From Swiss-Prot:
Organism of provenance: Haemophilus influenzae (strain ATCC 51907 / DSM 11121 / KW20 / Rd)
UniProt-listed PANTHER family: 60S RIBOSOMAL PROTEIN L35/50S RIBOSOMAL PROTEIN L29, LARGE RIBOSOMAL SUBUNIT PROTEIN UL29C
InterPro entries: Ribosomal_protein_uL29, Ribosomal_uL29, Ribosomal_uL29_CS, Ribosomal_uL29_sf
Taxonomic classification: Bacteria, Pseudomonadati, Pseudomonadota, Gammaproteobacteria, Pasteurellales
Entries under SUPFAM superfamilies matching the protein: Ribosomal protein L29 (L29p)
Protein name: Large ribosomal subunit protein uL29
Amino acid sequence: MKAQDLRTKSVEELNAELVNLLGEQFKLRMQTATGQLQQTHQAKQVRRDIARVKTVLTEKAGE
């Protein structure tokens, strides 16, 4: 997910994306805690996607 793609979305779409990513992050954390997560890079990727969405939301709030 690129920030440029996120900038074209509306605030409602960004909030929905943020909720989805937070749910995904929770699932990944539970898998990590139980030792089931094989692809550990996914946690880092989701964390950075959350940061990208929050950054774009902050930019849109300033407009």
